[in-house]
Amino acid sequence: MPSNKSVSDAPITQFVNCRILKNHKLQWEDLWVREGKILNPEKLFFDEQGFADHRVDCENKIIAPGFIDVQLNGGYGIDFSQASSDIRGGVALVAKKILEHGVTSFCPTLVTSPPHIYHKVIPELRVQDGGPEGAGVLGIHLEGPFISEEKRGAHPPKFLRTFQSGGVADLMETYGQLENVAMVTLAPELTNSAAAIHELSSRGITVSVGHSMADLSQAEEAVQNGATFITHLFNAMLPFHHRDPGIVGLLTSDRIPPGRTVYYGMIADGIHTHPAALRIAHRAHPAGLVLVTDAVTAMGLPPGRHTLGQQQIDIQGLHAYVAGTTTLSGSIATMDMCVRHFREASGCTVEAALEAASLHPAQLLGISHRKGTLEFGADADFIVLDDMLTVRETYIAGQQVWRK
């Protein structure tokens, strides 16, 4: 068939012999890519009389949307909460390394820090597209400092803050600016938190409840005010109680505004959350589960003492502790590891495990029209996996950026 490239002269790549994750199912279907986007082959055939310039044989493997990690504190010796002399270089190193774990986009996460750290680091962590140099940056996740002292976890207590008014003045005094910020985790029981949630939501920033002593009614009020996420469900919050289920109760609450989905992060590293708790959460609210790594500086490093934010942490096996304690301090898990563990622990389908690391975080951030999906017109950020869910190849904008 002769080619009519009236629409674009850009080369077309056709991925064949693959099962692609689409419409919540793995389907035997080819994937077509041009100019960094997923292409509709019917339009190509009938409107352009076009054909593929390149064919890639996937050898019966799975193609899924690239993973999105909305809670990543650092890794490979880099701590995003440290105001180093080369902040951008550190982010670039982590962005490059996580390609091998299938992550094509992420939110660099800053833990509770003093204002001068935020003022220096936030302007340096700019939103940017991914590519051969590394995964894309979707925006910063600010985890703290407006959190509960009782549920601070590994966050240093001396830098915790409360809201004076909850307005923009509080936020600017602490953070310096909100450009490039995608998400803020706060404790909704703090006085004036409602005003802060309104302010952040009105700016298009995702508000998450976490590191909190909130009861269910306080959590529901936060959602009614605009919060849409729960930071690492079960961790650093009141445990589930049958008379007041606390933040966990949001998974089955009947007071969620119509049309709104509450999403929740889960650290499926086999340490932070018992497999039974994973199963309970997933079966209660499968559409809201978002896998996160909450990975810290020591991801990819040997055991020993490392830095996280303003604190020292000890790595012992697969555990990361606040130095000298048994308090967990993030994880050293990678996203592909979390996907495999979640699949095994929950007994969910392959499709559900993959979507928890791709579609759901994209929906949470309001970008599922272009990320976390293989629908026509979406960004061609995807991964090739074998049946064991081991990542074999990673693509960003249709370009191979990593291969095993």
Curated annotation (Swiss-Prot):
State which Enzyme Commission number(s) the record gives: 3.5.1.25
Picking any one GO biological process from the record gives: N-acetylglucosamine catabolic process
Q: Which InterPro entries does this one have? A: Amidohydro-rel, GlcNAc_6-P_deAcase, Metal-dep_hydrolase_composite, Metal_Hydrolase
One matching Pfam family? Amidohydro_1
Question: What domain of life is recorded for the organism?
Answer: Eukaryota
The reply on keyword Isomerase is: no
Which residues take part in binding a divalent metal cation?
E143, H211, H232
A molecular function annotated in GO for this UniProt entry is: metal ion binding
Q: Which cofactor does it need?
A: a divalent metal cation
Q: Where do the catalytic residues lie?
A: D294
Q: Which reaction does it catalyse?
A: N-acetyl-D-glucosamine 6-phosphate + H2O = D-glucosamine 6-phosphate + acetate
Q: Where are the transmembrane segments?
A: none
Pathway where this protein functions: Amino-sugar metabolism; N-acetylneuraminate degradation
What keywords were assigned to this record? Carbohydrate metabolism, Hydrolase, Metal-binding
Q: How is the cofactor bound?
A: Binds 1 divalent metal cation per subunit.
Q: Does the keyword Transmembrane helix apply?
A: no
Q: What does this protein do?
A: Hydrolyzes the N-glycolyl group from N-glycolylglucosamine 6-phosphate (GlcNGc-6-P) in the N-glycolylneuraminic acid (Neu5Gc) degradation pathway.
Q: Which family does it belong to?
A: Belongs to the metallo-dependent hydrolases superfamily. NagA family.
Q: What is this protein called?
A: N-acetylglucosamine-6-phosphate deacetylase
According to its UniProt entry, this protein's organism is Danio rerio
